[in-house]
UniProtKB/Swiss-Prot annotation:
The lineage of its organism: Bacteria, Bacillati, Bacillota, Bacilli, Bacillales. It comes from Bacillus cytotoxicus (strain DSM 22905 / CIP 110041 / 391-98 / NVH 391-98). Signal peptide: none annotated. This is Putative septation protein SpoVG. The gene is spoVG. Pfam families: SpoVG (PF04026). Belongs to the SpoVG family.
Length: 97
């Protein structure tokens, strides 16, 4: 299984969420609402979840092994950092005009 596409939108919120992503797996299956969170130990990826009646959050979809989790996290965070670099370049170019 490979992550074949990542669509990411940065968000400006008061909380720790930094972006929301959708990934495509093997050009065949899409998972929406993956969140990039700024945790105590750096950025991490949180899978889509919903709140249960007792207030807990349960993942709607999630990888079942650490290798797959790493592939997803690496792909999403790579795109997150790539977009950050693009925004910095665009900001610098706009300031240079």
């Amino acid at each position: 299984m490979e992550v074949t596409d990542v669509r990411l939108r940065r968000v400006n919120t008061e909380g720790r969420m930094r972006a929301i992503a959708s990934i495509t797996l093997d050009h065949e299956f899409v998972v929406h609402d993956i969140r990039v969170i700024d945790g105590n130990n750096g950025l991490f990826v949180a899978m889509p979840s919903k709140r249960t009646p007792d207030g807990e959050f349960r993942d709607i979809a999630h990888p079942i092994n650490s290798n797959t989790r790493s592939k997803i996290q690496d792909a999403v965070l790579t795109e997150y950092h790539r977009l950050g670099e693009l925004e910095e370049v665009e900001f610098e170019e706009a300031g240079a005009s």
